[in-house]
Amino acid sequence: MLEFELREIDRFDRAICISTDEMAFFSNVTGKVKLYYLPHFVERGKLIEKKKDIDIVFVGSSNEHNQRGLIWFLEDVYPRLKEYNFSIAIIGEIVDKIDLAKYSNIISMRHVEKLEDIYSRTKIAISPLQSGTGLKIKIVEALSYGIPVVCTFKSIIGFPNKLENGCIIADEPKIFANAIIELIKDEKLYNEMQKQALRQYEMIFNANRAQESIRNIFQIESKIK
């Protein structure tokens, strides 16, 4: 796959990278190609006034990286959270691949009509990925709703800044569990992480900001007077 990407990218004068890590890599291995950074952007999430009855949410497809990450969470992190009786929601096609019935206080939904309904009820999101590359879109979505994220370092690959971005990074099960507990229990910390999440979204992933970047990349003059 890498050889294919390197061969194909050299056919073009310009290339767009949605990840700063990928941009840094390609800048070292390509010659003539002009590289631009354009992260995946989303519209600002609109929260609905609802009771926050979901403590933790994981949203994901059924790909092998999500499966591996969720299994790690369920086997190594979840047992450390059981005494707190947190409400956990697993959303997406991932629920077809993992038997969740044996876990108490976990609700699973293969499909939801509007993710905003789930995010409006959610306190924090998790991304326990153990493998994979590229920008994790579900983290971006959570940040757009001002939802703090507890994640592994693998999950944060592709973000231009790894600190003060609305995410707490933890690669060890005990540290991951403690980060979840502290974030849910400590209101002051939670409020600060919410602010970081929204600030990160506005600075990097806001759709309006992306439009200006696109104009610069394609050298399109803005028609906004």
Set out the residue ranges of the language-model regions.
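Conserved catalytic-core segment of nucleotide-activated headgroup transferases in glycan assembly
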Residues: L2, N28, Y36-S108, V112-S120
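Short acidic/histidine- and often glycine-rich active-site loop of Leloir-type glycosyltransferases
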Residues: F153-I169
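Conserved acidic donor-binding segment of nucleotide-sugar-dependent glycosyltransferases
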Residues: C167-K174, E182-E187
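Acidic donor-binding loop of glycosyltransferase active sites
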Residues: S120-G134, Y145-P148
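Short glycine/proline-enriched, acidic/aromatic patches that form the donor-sugar handling elements
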Residues: K97-I98, L115-E116, T133-K136, S155-P160
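A charged, aromatic-enriched C-terminal amphipathic alpha-helix characteristic of glycosyltransferases
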Residues: K188-Q219
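Short hydrophobic beta-strand element within catalytic cores of glycosyltransferases
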Residues: K138-E141, P148-T152
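Membrane-proximal helix-turn-helix segments that form the acceptor-binding/catalytic region
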Residues: M1-A15
